[in-house]
């Protein structure tokens, strides 16, 4: 079974929610619920409101995603 292609988009963190969840507004003005990837959590990378992030979305559910990179 091959791995499906994930969609990567840029966005801005709007709000911080419990359990390392975030509301992120994407470039196309959609708001998604995103959590931190495991490597970011392991390396204690902090994400604050207003940060520019890269979000990975699966084609199956475009309302949830994973934050994989925080821009400087």
From Swiss-Prot:
<dbReference type="GO" id="GO:0043022">
    <property type="term" value="F:ribosome binding"/>
</dbReference>
<comment type="similarity">
    <text>Belongs to the IF-1 family.</text>
</comment>
<dbReference type="Pfam" id="PF01176">
    <property type="entry name" value="eIF-1a"/>
</dbReference>
<dbReference type="GO" id="GO:0019843">
    <property type="term" value="F:rRNA binding"/>
</dbReference>
<dbReference type="InterPro" id="IPR006196">
    <property type="entry name" value="RNA-binding_domain_S1_IF1"/>
</dbReference>
<dbReference type="GO" id="GO:0005829">
    <property type="term" value="C:cytosol"/>
</dbReference>
<protein>
    <recommendedName>
        <fullName>Translation initiation factor IF-1</fullName>
    </recommendedName>
</protein>
<keyword id="KW-0963">Cytoplasm</keyword>
<keyword id="KW-0699">rRNA-binding</keyword>
<comment type="subunit">
    <text>Component of the 30S ribosomal translation pre-initiation complex which assembles on the 30S ribosome in the order IF-2 and IF-3, IF-1 and N-formylmethionyl-tRNA(fMet); mRNA recruitment can occur at any time during PIC assembly.</text>
</comment>
<dbReference type="InterPro" id="IPR012340">
    <property type="entry name" value="NA-bd_OB-fold"/>
</dbReference>
<comment type="function">
    <text>One of the essential components for the initiation of protein synthesis. Stabilizes the binding of IF-2 and IF-3 on the 30S subunit to which N-formylmethionyl-tRNA(fMet) subsequently binds. Helps modulate mRNA selection, yielding the 30S pre-initiation complex (PIC). Upon addition of the 50S ribosomal subunit IF-1, IF-2 and IF-3 are released leaving the mature 70S translation initiation complex.</text>
</comment>
<dbReference type="GO" id="GO:0003743">
    <property type="term" value="F:translation initiation factor activity"/>
</dbReference>
<keyword id="KW-0694">RNA-binding</keyword>
<dbReference type="InterPro" id="IPR004368">
    <property type="entry name" value="TIF_IF1"/>
</dbReference>
<keyword id="KW-0396">Initiation factor</keyword>
<keyword id="KW-0648">Protein biosynthesis</keyword>
<dbReference type="InterPro" id="IPR003029">
    <property type="entry name" value="S1_domain"/>
</dbReference>
<feature type="domain" description="S1-like">
    <location>
        <begin position="1"/>
        <end position="72"/>
    </location>
</feature>
């Amino acid at each position: 079974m091959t791995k499906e292609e994930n969609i990567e988009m840029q966005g801005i963190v709007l709000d911080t929610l419990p359990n390392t969840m975030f509301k992120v507004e994407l470039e196309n003005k959609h708001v998604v619920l995103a959590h931190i990837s495991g490597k970011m959590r392991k390396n204690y990378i902090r994400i604050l409101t207003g940060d520019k992030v890269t979000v990975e979305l699966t084609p199956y559910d475009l309302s949830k995603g994973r934050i994989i990179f925080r821009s400087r």
